[in-house]
């Protein structure tokens, strides 16, 4: 009996900040791997999520939002995005219902014609009626030459199963790259730091969330609990004061929320210690960015 060959490949998700890339990634993988907050530029690293079945394996990469870099950290984020495109087999280009322009990086990919591009129109639940949706799809058909245009609603999970089927059309025949039970190539410490950073993004406004880097200095698993010590770096003394808050109350609230999220993620009781340290101008220093795991 003839059986289809096993398929495996790399799929990169790109789009502007806050378009829903991390929500889509989490829907596709079925696990909460990417930080999701209402703030733009939430994703700083390329995060890999793996979906495996009997006859296929898809390695998804959620990338930082497309932006014009304002400092070294953002330069590094854009390097990561471009690096993710090098080995990708399929590109998922996510737009929302208000977008009308094609980012230069997407124009470049389309001009090369090497990678099939699936244009995903997200947040279609916010469109008033079928006619408006059809008009939007037609607009993009006239504007770009892509492999497919697929309307989705990532938050609600609409069209996600169908999207997986569309991706498999373009995925090459290949043995699995990772063990079938593996969900990501990132270590637990990475996600612990991201979960703490997520709570900071939720709680603080303006510049504070973007000046923060979280480093896990201790991750010790004991019989009944996991001991975690996190160092939170900021750029200015004033930011440290705001982060800690009056009598340490603000940081305490971050710690409570982070511990609850960590216990859910790690499925074990967590003892969390947090410290704050000033590291002047870390976002603009290549050596420090490399130390924190960003590409130069």
From Swiss-Prot:
Region (G5): 152-154
Record-listed GTP binding positions: 15-22, 62-66, 122-125
All copies of domain Era-type G, residue ranges: 7-173
A single cellular component GO annotation: cytosol
Keywords, alphabetical: Cell inner membrane, Cell membrane, Cytoplasm, GTP-binding, Membrane, Nucleotide-binding, Ribosome biogenesis, RNA-binding, rRNA-binding
Pfam families, per database record: KH_2, MMR_HSR1
Keyword Phosphoprotein applies: no
Region (G4): 122-125
Membrane topology term: Peripheral membrane protein
Entry-linked InterPro entries: G_ERA_dom (IPR030388), GTP-bd (IPR006073), GTPase_Era-like (IPR005662), KH_dom-like_a/b (IPR015946), KH_dom_type_2 (IPR004044), KH_sf_prok-type (IPR009019), P-loop_NTPase (IPR027417), Small_GTP-bd (IPR005225)
Record carries keyword Cytoplasm: yes
Gene Ontology terms, MF aspect: GTP binding; GTPase activity; ribosomal small subunit binding; small ribosomal subunit rRNA binding
NCBIfam families, alphabetized: era (TIGR00436), PRK00089.1 (NF000908), small_GTP (TIGR00231)
Subunit and interaction comment: Monomer.
Name this polypeptide is given: GTPase Era
Taxonomic classification: Bacteria, Pseudomonadati, Bacteroidota, Cytophagia, Cytophagales
Gene: era
């Amino acid at each position: 009996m003839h059986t289809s060959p096993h398929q495996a490949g790399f799929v990169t998700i790109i789009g502007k900040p806050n378009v829903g890339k991390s929500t889509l990634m989490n829907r596709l993988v079925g696990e909460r791997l990417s930080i999701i907050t209402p703030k733009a530029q939430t994703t700083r690293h390329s995060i890999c999520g793996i979906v495996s079945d009997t006859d296929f394996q898809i390695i998804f990469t959620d990338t930082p939002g497309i932006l014009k870099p304002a400092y070294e950290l953002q330069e590094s984020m854009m390097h990561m995005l471009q690096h993710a495109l090098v080995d990708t087999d399929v590109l998922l280009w996510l737009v929302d219902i208000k977008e009308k322009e094609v980012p230069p990086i997407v124009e470049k990919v389309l001009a090369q014609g090497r990678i099939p591009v699936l244009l995903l129109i997200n947040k279609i639940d916010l469109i008033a009626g079928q006619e408006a949706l059809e008009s939007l799809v037609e607009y993009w058909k006239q504007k770009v030459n892509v492999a497919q245009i697929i309307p989705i609603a990532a938050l609600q999970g609409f069209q996600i199963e169908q999207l997986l089927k569309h991706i498999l059309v373009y995925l090459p025949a290949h043995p699995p790259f990772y063990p079938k039970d593996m969900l990501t190539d990132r270590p637990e410490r990475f996600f612990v730091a991201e979960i703490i950073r997520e709570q900071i993004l939720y709680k603080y406004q303006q510049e504070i969330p973007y000046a923060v880097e979280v480093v896990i200095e201790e991750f010790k698993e004991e019989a009944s609990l996991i001991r975690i010590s996190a160092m939170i770096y900021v750029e200015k003394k004033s930011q440290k004061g705001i982060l800690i808050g009056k009598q340490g109350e603000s940081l305490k609230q971050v710690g409570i929320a982070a511990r609850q999220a960590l216990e859910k993620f790690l499925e074990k009781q967590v003892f969390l210690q947090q410290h704050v340290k000033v590291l002047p101008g870390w976002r603009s220093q290549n050596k420090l960015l490399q130390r924190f795991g960003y590409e130069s």
